[in-house]
Structures are given as structure tokens and as C-alpha cells.
Amino acid sequence: MVTPLTEPGVFPEVLQVELDCLLQHLGRTTGEATTTVVPAGPVVGTTLPISLTSTTTYEAANGDLLSQKFAGTGQIDVVTLEVEFQGMETFEGGTGRFSDAVGFAHSVGSASFVTNVGFLITKGRLAY
């Protein structure tokens, strides 16, 4: 679920994203991300290039928290409101078994502002 924290279409746009994930080290996981979207250039055709940053807190089933930061690029189709993005995640700290966690991952995903649903594939390493 994506909730705009700023007026839609006004940049930088700040979004609150509720997550429901299946992650290898955490299992079934929920999370909350605050994402900032900034145009990275002019609209070309129907495509707006963007840069994204976010901070996320993942919560494992047992309540342990894992902190993550993301920086990447993407594009928004200004007609369909479909978004594609990619970037790097860094993991650092948390609570419980993740208190000393460090790691990284490359992520590729897509989302729709119409359906309010997104998909993310991430691959990397996490040590804790």
C-alpha cells in the first residue's frame, strides 16, 4: 500500500510504503518504507526519469527489526502511472539477531500507482 505524504505530482514526492515480503533471512516479513522520488530529467514521450531514495524497517515474524536504505533510478509512465526502478540496498543494524547486521543487495522492481501494488526482486548478501 502506497500513501503519498506530499501532494501527488509535486516533487520531491514523499511516499509511505507498507510492505509484505518473503525474504530469505527473515521469512514472511512486513515493513514500512519512506521513499522520496525526484525527477532526473524532463519527460520524454510519456516517460519521466526519476531518482529514488528510501529508508525501510523490515520486521521479521519474531519481531526482530532490520534497517535498510535504498538508492536507485527508474522511470514513471505519466499516462499509465506504471513505475519501473532499480538500485542498491544497504543493510545496517536493527534489533535482536539483526543488531549487528550488514549487507547489500541489487534490486529491480515495478509498481503501479493505479493498482497500488508493486513487485521487487532483490539479490545480495546479509551477515548478522
Write out the residue ranges for each language-model feature.
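Beta-strand-enriched cores of mature, soluble protein domains
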Residues: M1-Y128
